[in-house]
Structures are given as structure tokens and as C-alpha cells.
Amino acid sequence: MKLFPVKTTLAAALLAATAAATAAPTWITIGDKAHALVAKVAPNARTLASRQVPVNVPVSRGSAALRASSEGVHVVEIDDGMLPTLSLAIHRNQRKCGGFLKHETMAEALAVLHRVDGAPEQELAPSYAIDNQTIVNALLPQLQASNILSTITQLSNFQNRRYNSTHGVAASDWLFNQWKALNPGNRRDVQVRQITHTWAQKSVEFSIIGSGNSTETVILGAHLDSIASGGVETARAPGADDDASGVAGLTEVIRAMMAGNYVPKRNIRFIAYAAEEVGLWGSQAIVNQQPGRRDKVVGVMQLDMTAFQGDSTDIWIYTDFTNAAQNQFVANLVGAYLPGYSVGYDACGYGCSDHASWHNKGFIASFPFEASDATYNFQLHTPNDTIATFGGTANHALKFTKLALAWMVELASDGTPAQAQAAPAATSKTASR
């Protein structure tokens, strides 16, 4: 996610990266603030096109009332070897990760620029009726903060989970095996797989095939990797909050659904993305692997940092580069299933987590977050992003796990509460690719 600003010169890093940079061009879309660093990091980069993108932002931090605003988004041609240095500059100067997305071709980047407001096709919008209380209320009590904390602990015990380190590879393999173990009855409608990319770390996916409308899919995501300054292998980056907390939330929702023999009507996919911290590479690659499947995704939610309560508000919903109708649905779910929890609203800028990869291609996406943009966990991307930073409990993360379960069941059950029947048992489909 984001990074607390530190007063560190980038001269040495820039010099080394410049020397190592290749001449191979690549194309990125990048927000205004991050774009201001491009000339310093890569003087030979070229801005090819720019656009002011309309966004909705709160009239004041926390307010549900929104006002129309805009953010500049730019298409930049840059040497591929300079992207890690650009990432580092954004981390250190603007207390955030992401801020840009890498694209395979110039044409793809330009196409994203011209639809980055993410306006969905009308026929993709699902019903946002809250009408699956029987299923949701049966599953919510199964969610346990202790289970979430256990997963966070195990993930943060890796030296780091960097996308190109042996530790990052091992973390992906560990999660793959953990998710496989959540299907002990070998349900044949369940598939667990690793998704291979052009870098070392694999994304991990747990999916359940819908029993009825299996041409439509609901996606809950988090990112698996972590990052901190230092060597690829030696840097200590526990990433307990960023984003072991989100992955742990996904894991607990899967566990509860499997224990409750939940069978969705729509397909559901849980995805732990690789390489979020260096520009949303994993989610971008997965979105790009879906030609012909675009009209099947009816909703996306991202859990990225859920464990640190930075202020008195329980759940923050970020309104820029997300879908307003689904955001309202998320807020309505809090009122329906999490009574007493408060909701605030804020904005985080272009490309601040993996939901942006989906939003940029026109999919409906939302991003609930642990705190406001001013009060979140500033220890991320450091060796201090540990369980101790958020008090040694997963009580705050449990709120988001409950919200994610309610969201997924309400969308995946397609308004039919009777879908929580016993699941079919047979050999599961388990693959690695």
C-alpha cells in the first residue's frame, strides 16, 4: 500500500539503477503525484498522453457526501529497468506504493487511459438487494480473530515476501498448501492453483464454481508480497499489516465457507496477488489473462491493510477510482450485518492497490481500508510492520473479514438464499501453473 515519508536521498539508488537499466521500453499509466517524480528518476522517459480523469471524493475527510473532482493520469514510455527505482522513489517520497500500472503495449496503456474512469457496462451491474440473511448470519459467527492472527503470524515470519526473492516464492507455496488444506472433503467444484508470472513469485487462487449462474464471477483479493528497503534476500519485511492481514482475511472467509458447506450460485474467486508492491504487476497480469471473460466479473473487492485501527472509525471506504454503486452497497452491508460499526470515506489516488487493475478495465471494484489516508499504519514497508504495531490482535481485521464474507455471499448467491446446501464431494481440481 503506502509508505511513511522518510528523508532519504535517492542519489545512490538512482545511479545504480540507471547503470543497470536496460534500453527496453515499457509503458505505464501513472497518477499526477507519482508522475512528478518521473523526470528525476528517468530523464529519458517520455510522456505520450495525459488526461484529467473524473473521480468522486468526500467533501471532507470521513464524509459520505461526495463532490466531483479529477486527477491527472498520464501514459509514459520508460525503460523497463527503471521501474523498480520509480517504485522506490514513490515509496520514499509519497508514502505509497503503486501509483502506476505497467502495460504490455503502448496501445493497451492508451486504451486504459481513455477508460480509466472505470464506467462499467450497464448489463454487468448486479442487484444490490440484501436478501441472503439466512446464509450470511449462519456463516458470520464462524469467523474468528484468532484464526486471522495465526495466518498473519505465519506469513510475517517469512524474512520477506518480495516478489523476486526465494522467501516470496516460499510464501506463495506455503499459502497454496494452506488453501488446499481447506478443502479436506475434495469438493469437485473447488479449484486451488498457483498462477505463474514472468517473475519468481506466483499468485495463488482458490475458486468455487457456481451451481447456477456459473458464467458470472465475484472476486475477493489481497496481495501476497511484502517489501522494505535492503537486499532482495536479506531485507526484513514482515508485512504483517501490509498485506498479511488481507490474505488472512481471505483465508478465514474460505475456511468459514468450506466449513459451512456453502455453494454459491455465481463463481467465486479468492486471489492472493503477487508483486503488488512494485506497481500492481500480479493483478494487472491476471486481468490481462481474461480476454472473453470481461462480462463475467460482476464485482471485485480488495483487502489491503485491515489490522491497524488508526482512528475511531471502524471501516473506511475509498471513493476515487472505485465504483460508487458498489461502494454504497458495501456501506449498506455494514449497516445490515455489522451494527454499531461506523463508516468513513476518503480517497487514495491512482493505482493505490490491486482493485485499480480491475477498475481500469471497466470492472466494478471497491476498496474498504483500515483507516483514513492520514491515520493508517505508517510502519508499512519497514521491518516494524509487525503484529505488535496493531496491538497483537486481529480484532480490527475481523471487521473487514466479516464485511468481505457478507459482500461475497450477497453477490454470489444471486438473491437466492437457498444456495447453502451441502456441497458435492469428489476429487478436487488442484493445479499449479
Name the predicted role of every residue range.
Residues D311-P424:
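Active-site-adjacent substrate-binding region
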Residues E108-S165:
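N-terminal hydrophobic or amphipathic helices/low-complexity stretches enriched
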Residues T134-L143, S156-H167, Q191-Q194, V232-D243, ...:
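Second-shell loop/turn segments in exported
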